[in-house]
Amino acid sequence: MFDGFLRAAAATPDIRVADCKFNGASAAALVSEAYEQGVSLLVLPELCLTGYTCSDLFLQESLLDGAQKALITLAESTRDRNMIVLAGLPLTVNSVLYNVAAVLHDGEILGFVPKSYLPTYSEFYEGRHYHSGADIETEILFNGRKYPFGTKLLFRCRQMPAFTLGIEICEDLWVAQPPSIGHALAGATVIANLSASDETTGKDIYRKSLVSGQSARLVCGYIYADAGEGESSTDLVFGAHNLICENGSFLAESERFCNQMITADLDLSKLVSERRRMTTWQPKFNDDYRIIEFDLEMHPLELRRYIDPHPFVPDDRTDRARRCEEILTIQAMGLKKRLAHTHCQHAVVGISGGLDSTLALLVTVRAFDMLDMDRKQIMAVTMPCFGTTDRTYHNACELVHRLGATLEEVDIKAAVTLHFSDIGQDPSKHDVTYENGQARERTQVLMDIANRLGGMVIGTGDMSELALGWATYNGDHMSMYGVNASVPKTLVRHLVRYCADTADSETLKETLLDILDTPVSPELIPPEDGQISQKTEDLVGPYELHDFFMYHILRFGRHPAKVYRLALQAFAGVYDAATILRWLKTFYRRFFAQQFKRSCLPDGPKVGSVAVSPRGDLRMPSDACVTLWMQELDEIVE
């Protein structure tokens, strides 16, 4: 356990029906295996110390005594193992039999949680043997000592309070109001379900939907351990369908009909962050719940979890295509509404031959098609200046032609040169004034053309540029509607690729592919030998890194050190530690310093879970200090 991560396991032991000694030894073997794998929470199935299918044998004292002895032995196997283990058994309390989960830690029993809902329908007959433990909160005597017993028990790690465990048993999940709802609202971040769910055709799909839905609804980790081979096959077969889910996403799933252990690293700090962000998450400080604390040693964990280096871009090609179509539609629908509301008949787009302006033009074309407006009323303006290359100029012109928009060329060299003369700027000095003077001239041209036509200037800047402040204030920073404002650079590339793949013209596809192949550049510095000399990623860092940083910082509010650690894993073999740390510091420094630009952004549609609009997802002071975050980064030892 480290950095808010918890390695959890769900395991199905090999059992023999009613052979408690064998079953206890089998469970203990899984404890040893889990310990070797660095597991901090091991969940075993319902009634695994006896077998779920003992039926009327549950009324035999020999079986019940054997289960207790097996539990005592199993508890001892957890000593000095730095883990929590959950195991199921039948337990008699005040002459009444309960189906319970025992919570074991460091050789001790922490408590017992009974099953609330007992199915007595179809193939199930639990009401014949057991009583419901719903709403029971007491202490019981077991093996000469008193232990907590009840459904409202939570188990919390002192060293990492984000690890707070709630427990339910099998059918408890299948009812209208599962106990896990109360557990989560009382503070549980992890729900363990000890289950014995038999297999019938199609049941696995429904089971997965229950686990996924509950995990998402409760913003929690959900570990589901299922009974498997070894249970009686008199009437039923059990598939050992083990599942580990986090906030609706499956981290691990066992192969059915094969007893095995699955493990996954739950990100508990992410769950806490998500709950904190959602103001509709309203915990109930319920005095009925009893918190039982335990100790676990904190140690670095070599993550087995896949960390997506491109969190804004789906890996699956089909899903990516669907997502691209959806995003393009959202962008176009936003612009469509603005055009219709303003009765605007013209759109003005500055087109450079780069990715962002290409996407903005493609979106504008979609919006005009939705409105049944003539594409010729889209004024695509190319404004060559000192840094423009033949390649980008040609691609800009070709793109406009293939899309059927109107092309207007305004060479701004003379205007910018005159402006430099007016303000005393040396044109041979390629500083920020030299660059920003061109950007602001372009914006002025676009705004004035829009006024001439009674049109609207469509913004081209993307979210990655806005996060870094890589935009000229009141230059390309400004427009009348910014269609790309919540689209990160890594996603821009895939959106343009999708448009190329679905283009109805081979020449349009070729143009888009060449634009994709062109280095990202503002082209504000003169080229060298006709080639782009100013490459954005050489100056501010790789956009794939910055998009990764942005996602984890804005979406989950992670500590800088954790962002760094995740990036090391996500980009292993791509960037070394020094490179990642260098650009992470750059991101934080620029992100804080450039907020003043984001504080006055034009309107634009939100397309994903992260956005930087000052009216929506990011309401941040423009003069906040970055010191706290930089100090944490300075403490990192590479």
Give short role names for the model-derived ranges.
Residues 6, 23, 161-163, 220, ...:
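ATP/NTP-dependent adenylation/nucleotidyl-transfer catalytic domains that generate, transfer
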Residues 1-350, 366-375, 407:
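Enzyme catalytic cores with a strong preference for nitrogen-chemistry domains
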